[in-house]
Amino acid sequence: YLGELRTEATHLQSNTTIFTDAPKDNHGKGEMFSPTDLVATALASCMISIMGIVAMKEGITKVDGTTAEVTKIMYAEPRRIGEIHITIIFPQGNYTDKEKKIYEHAAYTCPVAKSLHPDLKQVIDFVWQ
């Protein structure tokens, strides 16, 4: 804890450091990701990572260049993440219907998605270019 509602976390294996701030609507500076922002971002990152693993294992169209737009909606009483909306945007590619189904299934089975409380609404949209 660095004070002023800011934290620092270091990944020991890579020595990479991240910082968090409490959001402005909760007495923080909001200059960095909040802890709940990291949860929402972790969900999107996990989904795309699992799709990348599936692409490698199955030898199907790669997902390199895939991006995600993430929106987190907070609920009150108790304060918590109520909804995470993710739009996963795939780069141009010749994805078959079968590959699309495989990737969509992979996204929903990522460990972060399976670890979040069932009351947290996960809204996922897939955009195939």
Feature-to-residue mapping (PLM):
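Extended beta-strand/beta-hairpin segments
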Residues: Y1-T41, G52-Q129
